[in-house]
Design a protein with these regions (language model features):
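FAD-dependent oxidoreductase catalytic-site/capping-region signature
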Residues: 1-103, 108-110, 130-147
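A conserved FAD-binding loop/helix module that cradles the flavin
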Residues: 112-133
Length: 147
């Protein structure tokens, strides 16, 4: 879940080939995610046991977040879209609240993953944003949504 303790910033140590700082992610599960994970593992195990399997590898909740199992999944979040700048980084057109000429398109705009591949919604939002840039922003550069 999105919260103020999960964020991206510029790494003070690591740089790319052009000398620019790399993006750094600070993220870990909070108590609510731990509770959800424990509950989900228990429900999964109860369902599996009710099927009387000959072998069962019981599900367990993770204690710390690690990127390793997510190398081929659909990560989301980072620059969340929303109705106002207090709760989000981007408006509904994926335009930055702070810098009106910055549009950020991708799965980063979702607060969390709903457990489905976000490619379809990301594509739809890309068209939505491109249409707003072409038909509104280029004609009158500035915020597309009042803050």
């Amino acid at each position: 879940m999105a919260n103020r303790y999960n964020y991206y910033d510029l790494d003070p140590t690591y740089r790319n080939a052009f000398g620019q700082p790399l993006m750094r992610m600070t993220f870990d599960y909070k108590e609510n995610e731990h509770k959800i994970g424990r509950h989900a593992a228990q429900v999964i195990n109860d369902i599996a046991k009710s099927m009387n399997p000959t072998r069962l590898n019981e599900a367990t909740a993770r204690t710390r977040w690690t990127v390793v199992p997510y190398q081929s999944t659909h990560n989301t979040g980072g620059t969340i879209m929303g109705a106002n700048p207090r709760d989000s980084a981007l408006n509904k057109y994926l335009q930055s609240w702070d810098c009106h000429n910055l549009f950020v398109v991708g799965a980063n705009v979702f607060p969390h993953n709903a457990s489905y591949n976000p490619t379809g919604p990301v594509g739809a939002l890309a068209y939505w944003t491109a249409d707003a840039v072409k038909n509104r922003y280029l004609k009158d550069p500035g915020p597309l949504v009042p803050a």
